[in-house]
Every structure is written in C-alpha cells, then in structure tokens.
Amino acid sequence: MKEVIKERQGLYRQEFEHDNCGIGAVVNIKGKKSHDTVANALRIVENLDHRAGKDAEGKTGDGVGILLQISHKFFKKACKKEGIEIGQEREYGIGQFFFPQHEIKRAQAKKMFEIIVEKEGLEFLGWREVPVVPEVLGHKARECMPCIMQAFIKKPDDLEKGIAFDRKLYIARREFEQSNDNTYVVSMSSRTIVYKGMFLVGQLRTFFEDL
C-alpha cells in the first residue's frame, strides 16, 4: 500500500506521529473541586474511542482508565456507610486493588497487605468494595473480572502530608507486590486514585458507580 507523506501544515509535524494510546487532561485553572471536571475527563476518554482496541465480540476493550484527585467529601461519605472513619483531608491514603476471584486467595492477599501496612508503621483503617455494574461488560471481560476493593490507610501523626506520606505508602505497596503475585495494585496514594479496566471507553463511567 502506498504510504502518504504528509507535509508540514501549521503545528503538524510528521516526525511526531506515533501509533499509541490516546491521553487527555482536564483541570480547573482556579483549583475549584467539582464533579464537572471528572465529567469532562470522561468525555475526553469517550472521544478517544478511535485510539482504543476491541476484541472480536466488540464488547471487550484493551484497557481504559482515569486518574483523579481524591475527593475527600465523596470518600468521607462512602466510608461512613462502611463504618470507616478516615479523618481529615489528606490524613489518609487509598489503595485501589484488583483481587483474585477466588475467595480464599483474596482473603490471604488482604491479610498480607494489612500485616505489611502495620509493619511499616501505618494504621490500616478498613476495606471498601468498589460498587460496579458488571452487566455493562462484554462476556470475556466479565469472566475474568477481579474483585475490586479499596484499602484506607491512616497517616501517622509524626509524618508530613503529601510526598512524605506517599513515599511511605509506596514502600508498603512495593513490599506487598513483591510478596504477592495474584493481586494487582492499581494505585496507592493520599492525593490521587485510578479507576481502570479492560472495557470499552464508553463503559468506564457506567461500570464504576463512583464516577
């Protein structure tokens, strides 16, 4: 097939052409926290459908996700329903996990994480099962869907907020990852959280009820 050589036009440069996934970013320039920012980010994801892969059934994708600033207001309310007291904003970290479907293996992995957290001088606050809608997934994605859970970890009083706390969380994460090979840590931070999965771009907002 003949290759079409494109000339420079405006800001376009052929040398910057790549066959990769799409990416987008949305921020509020005044730093105002709003669900509108999340909604706009999800629209960007949905507009990048042409950059995403699909399997033969047309209902299972090759992966899509979104990274968000942790909403203290949202998680304080969600955790209260679970009987988890998370304290003040950025005084806690959230780990997002893909656990195995097997109940015993999942219980073992959760217990191992709790032990590691305590060993690192952090306080484990509790688990929250992430509310999802499996019905929107394709057959293949639904068959291998992990158990998605969030862990809440309290910041020690003698540790500063922000990077210092996140470093401590990272150490706990890495130790857990090296000790367990059947659980995937999606994210772990006191500032950001990631929601993602092997589904189509339009399924991201409908699969995760948190969004």
Where are these regions (language model features)?
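N-terminal segments that mediate ammonia production and transfer
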Residues: 1-211
